[in-house]
């Protein structure tokens, strides 16, 4: 199994540091051999390909040493994995700025006339250009003094990112409420909350998704919602405010050293969008389009709030006409029930976890010609962790890869939903092969003593989305690890996973593939209820997308221009929430401090979610026309989009599949505008 999985989690805390030191020594030795090759003897194979082989070994061990920072139940393991991640990150930054290594690649290109008349494949030529680009992004063209300064800045940014994420994962905030204060929250949901033993009858609400979301959605007590939202918006505010604000300043400084106006200009230069001007015009265009619709939606929600207040005998003279941020989820849900008769508590009875996972797996298996089989989990980090093999049913059941799933919340675990590509997959021309391994971490509703884990429809959508990332990794058919799976431009990486969300809104899929009542799996979601769910899909959709644009604009604002131009991130966040989302967060909060994307790889790139939805909607139009379970289309999707990873520009990938350039029309159509 170890031969296939290529992971080896250390058995003790001491092993982490020992293995990380050995890893750096081995990598240095390998680089030395590449650097010492005489200039006249340099070839693609002994310089570029040799580096990829070295990188693969480094990355495999690095995953083994750092991943458990996100998942281990042992705080000591999480801490040492974070320490090792900081050490390896510092080492990687220094390596990516080595002049002698860069010179080896430059010499190789010169020796081979920039490979202009070579028989290198398109992917090999891309490997050359991306390797050189990586060094140039790290300032190898700068004088030594500036390079040293840049290295110092990049190392500090990396350290800050690790601390920022760790603070969010380690948050232990919980608030105690009586049953009266939790009025409206379903009984079985309250049963899943931790009991407050010091106050009999009280329950704790943590800031994890399965606690916060039902509270904001169902609790009739506005003061409870206000308190929970305030705590959530203040998560890590003390620890992460200085980290976030310092990082923004450091990024600006780094961008200036590299010859860019600001960090957003630097990042966008290497993405599909090409420039920060294009990001800002895209966001502004979408904002203008959505705002009038959102104003209408807010008016309806305000009227509903007042109507309910008066129906309960409230005094019109003392009515508070404000519509607060903690009102949103609650009145949206009331409207869903009143206007569409969609009760999410009833809906989730038809989504028991074991039915949903089987259904989602079946959809992916049927559509993409693959098969998943549970296998004994290799070095599992928790008893709930499961592992599956993935084989290609269209090609003699050949193994494609393995994936882990770890789906329920626990202390110290990564608190959102994400997929880690632990081991890159590739097959070289000489037959050398490595199978990909991915890990999917989520925080779905846990089972209670009386009911199994029942997923909300939103959680079903999240599962489908994240599993799209898993399949992007499993489907990889590239020659070089640099291009494996989700190693694509950041503003394309969400396209496949967002595409698969559409299956969660298909009537046949919902009824026949994903649902089965938890008391009797043969009882499917009633057809009329599904039709009402689909009809309500775009309920208050403009508000939802304005919120996405608000987050993208906040991300863009802190990375555009000089950070000295804004006083602090809390004020900036509040202003953008007021002006853009039309619904400000509570004063005294700063949700930017727990906005993991900002220091988790989406810096100046949060626009990517909405941007890539335009691509996924364009692809889904074809499935919608020819059938969502069309195997021929599924095979095309797997081979033309998922399998190619980053081995070609993503603009080429999307145009190859569509037969034309994507546009925003398909997306606007899906949201009913």
UniProtKB/Swiss-Prot annotation:
Keyword hit for Magnesium: no
Top-tier EC class: hydrolase
Names of the cofactor(s): Zn(2+)
EC number: 3.4.24.-
Biological processes per GO annotation: peptide metabolic process; proteolysis
Keywords (A to Z) from UniProt: Hydrolase, Metal-binding, Metalloprotease, Protease, Zinc
Protein name, per record: Thimet-like oligopeptidase
Organism: Dictyostelium discoideum
